[in-house]
Amino acid sequence: NVDTANAMLLLSRLYLNSPKSFFSFLNNLVEDIDIDVELKVVLQEKNKSSVPDAAIMQESFKIAVETKLHNNFAEKQLLHHLASLEGYNYKFLMTLDPREMESNLKQKIDSECKNKNVIHINLTFKKLIEAVKEVVDDRDIDMQNIIADYERYCYDSDLIPDDWKRMRVVLSGTSFESNKANNLYS
């Protein structure tokens, strides 16, 4: 899926540019939970039988991503994705679509995720872009250009709805003169 690949390219570029920004992005998406998955370097860490000079460690985490274009998420498929997250300390299911997930399905998925200690992150492509912009410095021209390119791709591919730009107009047949007289067209 090209749309998933491009979204993951954006996130991988964010990580390569600044792991700290990537982890801030992740933390911002799950406001109520403090996620500590950044790389840690510890000197002289004591354990039961030894004290190594240093340790480099990182908590295990996995983000399973499912992208749809017409909000046609299948509950069964999403629940099967949860199995792929077993064994990780921090588990995320990211659902990505041009529109918000239907509320009944979101409640079911959120409930199942909670039971399995998985964090469900439901995003639109627009919200994904906004969340990335939030953690990237305005002076970081390279990342700003990457975000702008991705945003342009999303608009060109109809991943960000622009129906708010349209107005439904009912044509006036017999009432045109009356509408004009009442200044409806000014």
Regions found by a protein language model. Give the residues of each.
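Charged, terminal alpha-helix-loop-beta segments
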Residues: 1-186
